[in-house]
């Protein structure tokens, strides 16, 4: 456990020594701070100079990582050891994008051979849709793709297709359905033509309640309009491992794309779950996405901790969570194309590390994953940055931006990028009472009024942030960015001694929903309901009589 590691008391002592130091002082004393605390991997870079740390902090954090055998655990993951201990599974999302020739054997399966076989089928299928060779039941080309999934079968594909819209096929419109509410699927069905729509049903077991409910609604709508169930074969494909259930649905087994237990949902966009991505972007751009992730994989596996991007970000996060007692972490992308990135990282981070039981089954006596949240930065400035600047919470921030200007939008990117730099500087530097008072007096305010108002215009600063810069929003850079966060999550899971690759926390609510659903549908359940739940069940039933 973290608190039992030999470096932990050293970090506690060091924290007490520097907790009141202001970053302004470090910057004023060290003119090389920005260049020293900067790491670049091809066209992705990290400026971590605006963090409340110094060389001693980093040295101790690297020692902490060594205490946890981080290097050895990284290797264990890449080699296919069953590090998902509660489910007795390997964790090999890295194999989905591997360019290595060295085969990985897992329970007598040749992993890379299997992965590349599925990729080959995905490429052939996506080519047929994009080229117009694959036609609908009236011989129309496919114009709309509807991806039906939830969680990891939705968020990754949605995020990537949105981020890389400039690379998408101009004929294809992408739609993503995850919510079982009914509104979302009905809204999508209103917009599309059954004769030119391809539905992708993404569910490993092909039994996920939300996904199957939406898929059956889409199926019913399609059959009513096409007039014959046989047309399902041309318009529905599945990403699943349950061949029997897929065939019962009416989907041809040749239109089923498999994936494996060694790939968790939130790590699965590189697999057949990314079929919608490949269809939209094409195989060349999908390959670039994989290549960017592989580049980050190799960096994570081989770079020394001192210049290792995921290791640095993971350890810096631990520094704030377990020593500064930070409870929250903000993701602030300054790019409209990255608007879904925060909620993708929410799932990746919180479903992986939102746990309080160690690998040995013991209750952990320290904080683990913070609340991860965010929005597009420029909008957030006018919504909740007030709290970040002058509120009572210490909330570290990841600013994410690109250097590349958008075409046909002169002056826009300069304004956007200036705000990234200004916000990061403001969070670090702040504004003292004396500075605020001087500004007010220079504007001609009465001295007594200025003294009172100046208190409200103080920014304490010393608010930490990372700045992640991409040269441009491209497939390879998005691949590298996602892999960076995947590995950062892994690093923190190792430090906290938790299994980052199960998600038992999603199960209890699903189990309890079964008897409640029986009651709502008019059937009697033998389950016990607390008085609140029973009252609300009756309220619903009475309203809908």
Curated annotation (Swiss-Prot):
EC number: 5.3.1.9
SUPFAM superfamilies: SIS domain
MF terms in GO: carbohydrate derivative binding; glucose-6-phosphate isomerase activity; monosaccharide binding
Gene (name only): pgi
Function comment: Catalyzes the reversible isomerization of glucose-6-phosphate to fructose-6-phosphate.
PANTHER family from the UniProt entry: GLUCOSE-6-PHOSPHATE ISOMERASE
GO biological process annotation, one example: glucose 6-phosphate metabolic process
Family per record: Belongs to the GPI family.
Keywords recorded for this protein, A-Z: Cytoplasm, Gluconeogenesis, Glycolysis, Isomerase
Classification via InterPro entries: G6P_Isomerase, G6P_Isomerase_C, Phosphoglucose_isomerase_CS, SIS_dom_sf, SIS_PGI_1, SIS_PGI_2
GO CC terms in record: cytosol
Source domain of life: Bacteria
Uppermost EC category: isomerase
Subcellular location, record wording: Cytoplasm
Catalytic activities: alpha-D-glucose 6-phosphate = beta-D-fructose 6-phosphate
Pathway membership, UniProt: Carbohydrate biosynthesis; gluconeogenesis; Carbohydrate degradation; glycolysis; D-glyceraldehyde 3-phosphate and glycerone phosphate from D-glucose: step 2/4
Protein name in the entry: Glucose-6-phosphate isomerase
UniProt entry tagged with the keyword Hydrolase: no
Enzyme active site: 351, 382, 510
């Amino acid at each position: 456990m973290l608190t039992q590691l030999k470096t932990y008391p050293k970090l506690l002592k060091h924290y007490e020594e520097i907790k009141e130091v202001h970053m302004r002082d470090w910057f004023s004393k060290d003119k090389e701070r920005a260049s020293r605390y900067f790491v670049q991997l091809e066209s992705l870079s990290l400026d971590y100079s605006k963090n409340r740390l110094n060389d001693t902090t980093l040295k101790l954090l690297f020692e902490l990582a060594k205490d946890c055998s981080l290097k050895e655990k990284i290797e264990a993951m890449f080699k296919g050891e069953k590090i998902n201990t509660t489910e007795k599974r390997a964790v090999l999302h890295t194999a989905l994008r591997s360019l290595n020739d060295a085969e990985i054997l897992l329970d007598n399966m040749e992993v890379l051979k299997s992965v590349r076989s599925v990729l080959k089928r995905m490429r052939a299928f996506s080519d047929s849709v994009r080229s117009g060779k694959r036609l609908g039941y009236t011989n129309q080309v496919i114009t709309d793709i509807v991806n039906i999934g939830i969680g990891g079968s939705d968020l990754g594909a949605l995020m990537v297709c949105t981020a890389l819209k400039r690379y998408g096929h101009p004929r294809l419109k992408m739609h993503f359905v995850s919510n079982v509410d009914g509104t979302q699927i009905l809204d999508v069905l209103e917009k599309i033509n059954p004769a030119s729509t391809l539905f992708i049903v993404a569910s490993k077991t092909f039994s996920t309640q939300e996904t199957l409910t939406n898929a059956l609604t889409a199926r019913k709508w399609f059959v009513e309009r096409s007039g014959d169930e046989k047309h399902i074969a041309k318009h529905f494909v599945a990403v699943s491992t349950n061949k029997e259930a897929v065939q019962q649905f009416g989907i041809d087994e040749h239109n089923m794309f498999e994936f494996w237990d060694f790939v968790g949902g939130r790590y699965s966009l590189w697999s057949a779950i990314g079929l919608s991505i490949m269809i939209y972007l094409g195989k060349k751009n999908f390959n670039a996405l994989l290549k960017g992730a592989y580049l980050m994989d190799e960096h994570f596996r081989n770079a020394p901790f001192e210049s290792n991007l995921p290791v640095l970000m993971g350890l810096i996060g631990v520094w704030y969570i377990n020593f500064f007692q930070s409870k929250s972490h903000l993701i602030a992308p300054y790019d409209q194309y990255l608007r879904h990135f925060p909620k993708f990282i929410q799932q990746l981070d919180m479903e992986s590390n939102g746990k309080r039981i160690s690998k040995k089954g013991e209750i952990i006596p320290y904080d683990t994953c913070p609340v991860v949240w965010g929005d597009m930065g420029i909008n957030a400035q006018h919504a909740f940055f007030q709290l970040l600047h002058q509120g009572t919470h210490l909330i570290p921030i990841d600013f994410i931006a690109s250097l590349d200007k958008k075409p046909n939008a002169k002056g826009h990117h300069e304004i956007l990028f200036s705000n990234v730099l200004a916000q990061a500087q403001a969070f670090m530097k702040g504004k003292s009472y004396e500075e605020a008072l001087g500004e007010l007096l220079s504007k001609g305010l009465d001295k007594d009024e200025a003294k009172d108002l100046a208190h409200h215009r103080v920014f304490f600063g010393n608010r930490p942030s990372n700045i992640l810069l991409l040269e441009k929003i491209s497939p390879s850079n998005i691949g590298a960015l996602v892999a960076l966060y995947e590995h950062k999550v892994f690093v923190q899971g190792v430090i906290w001694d938790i299994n980052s690759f199960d998600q038992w926390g999603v199960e209890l609510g699903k189990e309890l929903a079964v008897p409640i659903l029986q009651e709502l549908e008019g059937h009697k359940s033998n389950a016990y309901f607390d008085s609140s739940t029973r009252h609300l069940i009756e309220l619903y039933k009475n309203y809908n009589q």
